[in-house]
Regions:
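N-terminal start-of-domain structural block
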Residues: 47, 59-69
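Active-site-adjacent "subsite" loops/lids of carbohydrate-active enzymes
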Residues: 94, 98-159, 163, 168
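Alpha-helical scaffolding within the catalytic cores
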Residues: 2-12, 42, 51, 75-80, ...
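The substrate-binding groove and active-site-proximal loops of carbohydrate-active enzymes
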Residues: 21-38, 65-75, 131-147, 162
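Loop/turn elements at helix/coil->beta-strand transitions in domains of secreted/extracellular proteins
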Residues: 18-22, 56-63, 87-93, 158-164
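Aromatic-lined substrate-binding rim segments of carbohydrate-active enzymes
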Residues: 72-93
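Carbohydrate-recognition beta-sandwich/jelly-roll modules
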Residues: 1-54
Length: 168
């Protein structure tokens, strides 16, 4: 929280001038069982059964979002999901937590910055990684995390996502 507040002093948050994002996020039903075919099926279900019955926000939009498991999709599959959502009149979204290590595997290499392992980027207190809600916190200012954030943000942009939800 303190890191976010300090950043807000330097770069205030952008105002959201649109209606509340409303729709579906894969975590609620699929959790760790998200697959590409299931994501497409949900987009089609919303299009065929719900959108025409006013299951939209005040901007007449539905947000269809991928949660945990999107990283098992190829870049081509992510783009195809976005294209499917657009064709179905939806805004494609994705959820990402770049400031945590859910695997809690200190020896795992950070693929976007070879030579660094997750133990190099953990936030420590009294020599122990700091854990919250089942994940280890990572240093958002570490060059390896910055490289990971740049790489993943560019992937989302190339795939065409219009909505990215991030948690600290």
């Amino acid at each position: 929280e303190e890191y976010a507040q300090a950043n807000a002093v330097i770069a205030p948050p952008k105002a959201w001038g649109k209606a509340v994002p409303f729709g579906w996020n894969s975590w609620g039903a699929l959790q760790f069982n998200l697959t590409y075919p299931k994501a497409l099926e949900v987009s089609d279900f919303y299009k065929e059964n719900l959108q025409s019955h006013h299951f939209v926000n005040s901007d007449n939009l539905v947000y269809t979002g991928l949660d945990s498991g999107w990283n098992s999709f190829s870049e081509e599959a992510l783009k195809a999901f976005v294209d499917k959502c657009k064709a179905n009149g939806q805004v494609a979204g994705v959820y990402w937590t770049p400031f945590t290590d859910w695997a809690k595997n200190p020896e795992r290499e950070i693929k976007e910055m070879p030579g660094y392992k997750y133990k190099d980027v953990y936030l420590y207190a009294n020599g122990k990684p700091q854990e919250l809600d089942g994940a280890y916190a990572v240093d958002p200012t570490h060059p390896a995390i910055e490289a990971m954030m740049k790489h993943t943000s560019e992937l989302f942009h190339r795939a065409g996502f219009e909505y990215v939800k991030m948690d600290f």
